[in-house]
UniProtKB/Swiss-Prot annotation:
EC number in record: 2.7.7.6
Organism: Enterobacteria phage SP6 (Bacteriophage SP6)
EC supergroup of this enzyme: transferase
Catalytic activity: RNA(n) + a ribonucleoside 5'-triphosphate = RNA(n+1) + diphosphate
Active site residues of this protein: D536, K623, D806
Family assignment from sequence similarity: Belongs to the phage and mitochondrial RNA polymerase family.
Role this protein plays: DNA-dependent RNA polymerase that catalyzes the transcription of viral genes.
The protein's name in its UniProt record: DNA-directed RNA polymerase
GO biological process: DNA-templated transcription; viral transcription
Length: 874
């Protein structure tokens, strides 16, 4: 018999050591790449020490101002560089070379070369800003770590500009002796201005080699001790959290619960946040929160071995079903053929262009773009495939146990999170499919069978249809035969891979086939399901705002009002955008469209609208901007969502092309180097200008509510105070964001860094307070809804519960109980008064002041209608 307690202690030791190994591996990758300055400890040192060195450089400059006599040769050159930039470059080079046995002279020359490059390419950037920005963007996209490569690319760019523009002169290299003096001067300033505990951080030392005295740099002993302590401390901060094989310790205080060993448990509090504030969040203050979290921790899970067996074969055979392929999208052996004739492939830039015909040059440009897209997609593929391997490995490890458990904790808004780095009920499709409830429950009644069928329909992709249609489709004989085939041989009958949630659907297929077989044998009552049937909110944030403001329009859009079929708010916004775009497709020559710096009219406008029509204006395009609206999204974040949509289309086409052994097709006509109006920037601006106002045409409640909350946050900041209010669960949400002054140092080729400066820490940041207030408020309320719902389920005897913020799951036969709790708790939260009025009054009473802020009026929507809505959670 297994000693599960002893095993749990061993697992937590592995979690602790796993976090250390992960940290050390990350840092070692930086060192191996020659970028020791990018290790965690050196990044910290850089940010702290730039300021004193910059002051040292300024003192050096001031020393010779107004002095008679000849100034040092280095001075004139250092006047061309900002102090902070020179300090950053110097320390970054020193840190990269410190442990390479480089001599003091070699380090000095490298520093000077980087300083020269900064001056040189700053000149280029000032003369051809847009062009150089494209060069830097291209370098960033290539993800190169090689400074030499970046330097060579910039030199080619400089040459190209000089050949086109007679007013721009090519760079004349600084003499070597000048470089040595510049580098030596900066190293002397570094030694004399940067201290730690009264000792210089960097100091020169000497050693004899072959009869010669060689000077080199080293760090002081105290800094070495600090680095060692930093490594040990940071490495232990983030254990590789994993499931438990015995129930986690119940939370009794904000600091006592969760994992079983001190070294792991001490890294997690029940609630993230300021320790002084967290102390207030006791069981007495919020008993329902403790009750809900501990119930979630007691839910028994187990590995779904059927799904595990399939995904292991998918990985072994690299089939790519529902997961990234394990074959690189692009590498040295698998790269699109270079269209440039072999005899010209060694040429670069303008020299290459002169040797090619216009058609060949365009083919070359297209090839470069295709390779860049593939390399970007490959980076993501590699990361995702590695995550799959880690997840499957952990599932294999825990498949030996009958039951496993998860530790839960909360963020500062009381949102609930599983504390597991890989395998988790809050994971992606594969992660959720690899888990199932330990408890198996029957599907005997009509209601239980209905929800079991609806679960399969949802996972397949019929979640926008009525419940009756979903059930009917699942009971269709042809669909049943497909599910039986899949369960019998999922690697031959692969229709499951095309489902909306492939692996969760596969898990359901295994159970459905078993159920059908038992029905055929007249033993249906023996069937037991282990799968959670999830009930998801319809854009939860907008649901909460619409409920608290009793907004009829919003309530209908997000299914708070009863309807014959589920309402699709993302699709509704997409339809508004489609109509607007259609008008521009038929626009006359007099019609103009302006967004930011982009103005389109006539032919240009029609072409842009037609391009988007061919790409497809779908709910996928509008989903993220709509979904994030209640959480503080802006027009700028809307534009970022449009970019993400296009990038996602490109990545999917690239992956499909590799799987089919062909060149990827273009999914859109937008190109950076086009001379017309169909550039990516213009396309993103155009679509953003259509989507952003369309959202407010469909829903208004979030906008007026967020405006009022921001006003309250501004009022608090003007008083130099934060916000603090009590959620329906008793959780006290505190928001107090202090101003910090951060100076970002930017270089042309060596990246940038935020340096921390000594600032007053008692000033509230007004802009940050206003930006965070509305998202925190609505997150706090949807988290409260989750906690209150879980408490009701516990009271009704439900012990198997899955939650992911606005998604709730339990067994099919308990789903009706869950749905009643979900709807009832939503009504109870808002039926008694106005949540926004309570928020305002709580602060006015504490501040003893009338803020003058007006609370938005509530509408006519009857909250009790929620109880009759079939699709509010579906």
């Amino acid at each position: 018999m297994q000693d599960l307690h002893a095993i749990q202690l061993q697992l937590e030791e592995e979690m602790f050591n796993g976090g250390i190994r992960r940290f050390e591996a990350d840092q070692q990758r930086q060192i191996a790449a020659g970028s020791e300055s990018d290790t965690a400890w050196n990044r910290r040192l850089l940010s702290e020490l730039i300021a004193p060195m910059a002051e040292g450089i300024q003192a050096y400059k001031e020393e010779y101002e107004g002095k008679k006599g000849r100034a040092p040769r280095a001075l004139a050159f250092l006047q061309c560089v900002e102090n902070e930039v020179a300090a950053y470059i110097t320390m970054k080079v020193v840190m990269d070379m410190l442990n390479t046995d480089a001599t003091l002279q070699a380090i000095a020359m490298s520093v000077a070369e980087r300083i020269e490059d900064q001056v040189r390419f700053s000149k280029l950037e000032g003369h051809a800003a847009k062009y150089f920005e494209k060069v830097k963007k291209s370098l960033k996209a290539s993800r190169t770590k090689s400074y030499r490569h970046a330097h060579n690319v910039a030199v080619v760019a400089e040459k190209s500009v000089a050949e086109k523009d007679a007013d721009f002169d090519r760079w004349e290299a600084w003499p070597k002796e000048t470089q040595l003096q510049i580098g030596t001067t900066l190293l002397e300033i570094l030694e004399g201005s940067v201290f730690y505990n009264g000792e210089p951080v960097f100091m020169r030392a000497m050693r004899t080699y072959g009869g010669k005295t060689i000077y080199y740099l080293q760090t002081s002993e105290s800094v070495g001790q600090w680095i060692s302590a930093f490594k040990e401390h940071v490495a232990q901060l983030s254990p590789a959290y994993a499931p438990c094989v015995i129930p986690p310790r119940p939370w009794r205080t904000p600091f006592n619960g969760g994992f079983h060993t001190e070294k792991v448990a001490s890294r997690i509090r029940l609630v993230k946040g300021n320790r002084e504030h967290v102390r207030k969040l006791t069981q007495k203050q919020m008993p329902k929160v403790y009750k809900a979290i501990n119930a979630l921790q007691n839910t028994q899970w187990q590995i779904n071995k059927d799904v595990l067996a399939v995904i292991e074969e998918v990985i072994r055979l690299d089939l790519g079903y529902g997961v990234p392929s394990f074959k690189p999208l692009i590498d040295k052996e698998n790269k699109p053929a270079n269209p440039v004739p072999v005899e010209f492939q060694h040429l670069r830039g303008r020299e290459l262009k002169e040797m090619l015909s216009p058609e060949q040059w365009q083919q070359f440009i297209n090839w470069k773009g295709e390779c860049a897209r593939l390399y970007t997609a490959e980076t993501k593929r590699g990361s995702k495939s590695a995550a799959v391997v880690r997840m499957v490995g952990q599932a294999r490890k825990y498949s030996a146990f009958e039951s496993i458990y998860f530790v839960y904790a909360m963020d500062s808004r009381s949102r609930v999170y599983v504390q597991s780095s890989t395998l988790s009920p809050q994971s992606n499709d594969l992660g959720k499919a690899l888990l199932r409830f330990t408890e198996g429950r029957p599907v005997n009644g009509v209601e239980a069978l209905k929800w079991f069928c609806i679960n399969g329909a949802n996972l397949w992709g019929w979640d926008k249809k009525t419940f009756d249609v979903r059930v009917s489709n699942v009971l269709d004989e042809e669909f049943q035969d497909m599910c039986r085939d899949i369960a019998a041989d999922p690697l031959t009958f692969t229709q499951w891979a095309k489902a909306d949630a492939p692996y969760e659907f596969l898990a359901w297929c295994f159970e459905y086939a078993q159920y059908l077989d038992l029905v055929d044998e007249g033993r249906a009552d023996e069937f037991r399901t282990h799968l959670p049937v999830h009930q998801d909110g319809s854009c939860s944030g907008i649901q909460h705002y619409s409920a608290m403001l009793r907004d009829e329009v919003g309530a209908k859009a997000v299914n708070l009002k009863p309807s014959d079929a589920p309402q699709d708010i993302y699709g509704a916004v997409a339809q508004v955008v489609i109509k607007k775009n259609a008008l521009y497709m038929d626009a006359d020559d007099a019609t103009t469209f302006t967004s930011g710096s982009v103005t389109l009219s006539g032919t240009e406008l029609r072409a842009m609208a037609s391009a988007w029509d061919s790409i497809g204006i779908t709910r996928s395009l509008t989903k993220k901007p709509v979904m994030t609206l209640p959480y503080g999204s802006t027009r700028l974040t809307c534009r970022e969502s449009v970019i993400d949509y296009i990038v996602d289309l490109e990545e999917k086409e690239a992956q499909k092309a590799v799987a089919e052994g062909r060149t990827a097709n273009k999914v859109h006509p937008f190109e950076d180097d086009r001379q017309d109006y169909l550039t990516p920037g213009a396309a993103y601006n155009y679509m953003t200008a259509l989507i952003w106002p369309s959202i407010s045409e469909v829903v208004k409640a979030p906008i007026v509510a967020m405006k009022m909350i921001r006003q309250l946050a501004r009022f608090a900041a003007k008083r130099n105070e934060g916000l603090m209010y009590t959620l329906p669960t008793g959780f006290i949400l505190e928001q107090k964001i202090m101003a910090t002054e951060m100076l970002r140092v930017r270089t042309c080729l060596m990246g940038d860094i935020k340096m921390s400066l000594q600032v007053e820490t008692d000033i509230v940041d007004e802009a940050a307070m206003m930006g965070a207030a509305a998202p925190n408020f609505v997150h706090g309320h949807d988290a409260s809804h989750l906690i209150l719902t879980v408490c009701e389920l516990v009271d009704k005897g439900v012990t198997s519960i899955a939650v992911i913020h606005d998604s709730f799951g339990t067994h099919a036969d308990n789903t009706l109980t869950l749905r009643v709790a979900l709807k009832g708790q939503m009504v109870a939260m808002y039926i008694d008064g106005n949540a926004l009025q309570k928020l305002l009054e709580e602060h006015e009473v504490r501040w003893m002041v009338d803020t003058g802020i007006e609370v938005p009026e509530q509408g006519e929507f009857d909250l009790n209608e929620i109880m009759d809505s079939e699709y509010v959670f579906a």
